[in-house]
């Protein structure tokens, strides 16, 4: 008799179960959806576009043309400590973020690309509030946001500069009106500055 769940079809289940058991935990500082993915292996009904800003944002991106598909080509999963460290070093080696002026749009593009290529739900790249240096809430992410010196901002003022370049926006994305740039700091892989400076963000972790 055997239906689709007969003994022969469950042969590989112990290996799958063991792999699930050994899955790395989500990194400290990730959002609610990543916590769902860690605990349940899926996004639960408590996190929908109506109840979670990250889900709503991701759903809205599916309507927009961003240059690549926004549906992940790999299984959806939470950002882990190891993945955050590895991704930080990968981007550093490729010269991707170091010294790049931060804007919400650029962060959104990065989040979508990582979501699409790696499957990490885009609720992990959050930072401490300003003014001053903004540290990543996700432990293992080695990029902080650092205010740009006025000299560097002034050097941007030329005829060939796009008015929509993030430096030209003079921090309009930022509540403190600071122009910020991504800066790699390898110490963030070992020292969770955000937890030290803002323990209130980690009460439910």
From Swiss-Prot:
Alphabetical keyword list: AIDS, Apoptosis, Early protein, Host cell membrane, Host Golgi apparatus, Host membrane, Host-virus interaction, Inhibition of host adaptive immune response by virus, Inhibition of host autophagy by virus, Inhibition of host MHC class I molecule presentation by virus, Inhibition of host MHC class II molecule presentation by virus, Lipoprotein, Membrane, Myristate, Phosphoprotein, Secreted, SH3-binding, Viral immunoevasion, Virion, Virulence
Post-translational modifications reported in the UniProt record: The virion-associated Nef proteins are cleaved by the viral protease to release the soluble C-terminal core protein. Nef is probably cleaved concomitantly with viral structural proteins on maturation of virus particles. Myristoylated.
Localization, UniProt: Host cell membrane; Virion; Secreted; Host Golgi apparatus membrane
Location of the region described as Mediates dimerization, Nef-PTE1 interaction in the Swiss-Prot/TrEMBL record: 108-124
Region (Binding to ATP6V1H): 148-179
Region (SH3-binding), start-end ranges: 69-78
Assigned protein family: Belongs to the lentivirus primate group Nef protein family.
Function: Factor of infectivity and pathogenicity, required for optimal virus replication. Alters numerous pathways of T-lymphocyte function and down-regulates immunity surface molecules in order to evade host defense and increase viral infectivity. Alters the functionality of other immunity cells, like dendritic cells, monocytes/macrophages and NK cells. In infected CD4(+) T-lymphocytes, down-regulates the surface MHC-I, mature MHC-II, CD4, CD28, CCR5 and CXCR4 molecules. Mediates internalization and degradation of host CD4 through the interaction of with the cytoplasmic tail of CD4, the recruitment of AP-2 (clathrin adapter protein complex 2), internalization through clathrin coated pits, and subsequent transport to endosomes and lysosomes for degradation. Diverts host MHC-I molecules to the trans-Golgi network-associated endosomal compartments by an endocytic pathway to finally target them for degradation.
Quaternary context: Monomer; cytosolic form. Homodimer; membrane bound form. Interacts with Nef associated p21-activated kinase (PAK2); this interaction activates PAK2. Associates with the Nef-MHC-I-AP1 complex; this complex is required for MHC-I internalization. Interacts (via C-terminus) with host PI3-kinase. Interacts with host PACS1; this interaction seems to be weak. Interacts with host PACS2. Interacts with host LCK and MAPK3; these interactions inhibit the kinase activity of the latter. Interacts with host ATP6V1H; this interaction may play a role in CD4 endocytosis.
This protein's name: Protein Nef
Provenance organism: Human immunodeficiency virus type 1 group M subtype B (isolate BH8)
């Amino acid at each position: 008799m055997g239906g689709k769940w007969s003994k022969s079809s469950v042969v590989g289940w112990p290996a799958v179960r063991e792999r699930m058991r050994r899955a790395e935990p989500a990194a400290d500082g990730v959002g609610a959806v990543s916590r769902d993915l860690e605990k349940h292996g899926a996004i639960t009904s408590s996190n929908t576009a109506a109840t979670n800003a990250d889900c709503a944002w991701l759903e809205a991106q599916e309507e927009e043309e961003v240059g690549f598909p926004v549906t992940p080509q790999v299984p959806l999963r939470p950002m882990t400590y190891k993945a955050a460290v590895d991704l930080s070093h990968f981007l550093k080696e490729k010269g991707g973020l170091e010294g790049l002026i931060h804007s919400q749009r650029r962060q959104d593009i990065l989040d979508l690309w990582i979501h699409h290529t790696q499957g990490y739900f885009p609720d992990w790249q959050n930072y401490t509030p300003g003014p001053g240096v903004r540290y990543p809430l996700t432990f293992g992410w080695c990029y902080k946001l650092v205010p740009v010196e006025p000299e560097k901002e002034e050097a941007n003022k030329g005829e060939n500069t796009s008015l929509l370049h993030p430096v030209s926006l003079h921090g309009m994305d930022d509540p403190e009106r600071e122009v910020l740039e991504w800066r790699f700091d390898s110490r963030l892989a070992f020292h969770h500055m955000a937890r030290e400076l803002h323990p209130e963000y980690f009460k439910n972790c």
